[in-house]
Amino acid sequence: MLKASLLFFVTALAEIIGCFLPYLWLRKGASMWLLLPAAASLALFVWLLTLHPAASGRVYAAYGGVYVATALIWLRVVDDVKLSLFDWVGAAVALVGMLIIVAGWRVN
C-alpha cells in the first residue's frame, strides 16, 4: 500500500506541475515556453497512472484521495496559504477513502 501511495503522490505532483506551469503563463505573465515542460509533465502524469495494477476506474478513484492531499500541500508550500482545519479534515477523509479502495485491490 505504501508503494501505491508514493506512486500516487508522484503522479499528483506531475499533474499539478503540468497544470501550474500554464497557469503561470496565462495568469502571471510567465513565458509561453513553460508550456513545453507542462506538456512533458502531463505526459508523465498519464504514464504514471498506467503503472498501477488495478482497473483504471479504481486507480482514478483512489488517486483522487492522494491528489486532494497533495494539492493542499502545494497550497501551503507553493502558494504560501495557511491550511484550515477543514483542509486537514478533508484531506484525511480523502486519504481514508483512498486506503479503503486500495485495500480492496487485494480482495479482487
Curated annotation (Swiss-Prot):
Short name of one Pfam family: UPF0060
Gene Ontology CC annotation, any one: plasma membrane
Domain of life of the organism encoding this protein: Bacteria
Cellular compartments annotated: Cell inner membrane
InterPro entries: UPF0060
Membrane-topology descriptor: Multi-pass membrane protein
Identification of the protein by name: UPF0060 membrane protein YE2027
